[in-house]
Amino acid sequence: AWMDIVASGSKYGRNILLLGNHSESAELTDKLRKKAAEKYVEKKISVPFEIPFTTLNKLSITLFNNAYYMKARSKTDFQHYDKYFYPLDFILNWNHIYSKSGLIQYQLNIPEEAGKDAVDKVLKKVVASGGGSFLAVLKKMGDQDGILSFPFKGYTLSMDFPVKKGIIEMCKELDAIVLDHGGRTYLTK
């Protein structure tokens, strides 16, 4: 699910839930079967240079999130798995929008039973701090497969924050919430 983690008040917690099913050829109409057989080439856009100052602030993130949310609507669509699993890969050099200051990618994993409370506390902390994230993605995770793998059964929330004053302190506060709920943060981001 895409989440708007800048919104507050009646818009707090709004999101777009994406669900998908694998399609068998026999399930498709002739038109969709032809589309599926075509080579998938996604149109890409690029941020060609590093922007010298951060354009990401509460106002710009709010405007983007409002537009993105309004564009989304309940619909059924047929799309290539690349577009479904990697929806932002059409933007090349996306990190340039964060200026030379850069960004912090923060990802947490919370046990399923603590998910609602922990995610709510994290979102409220981010909203209160004005930290806003241009990108926030919430996923439900299955059982942990490997002894050294990061994810375990529960929820993972990934957020990209522009580096600015107070961001390290906010991340430390998020760390405390995650630990209090039996979760973990992804240290290699």
Short names for language-model regions:
Residues 1-189:
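Noncatalytic alpha-helical scaffold of FAD-dependent oxidoreductases
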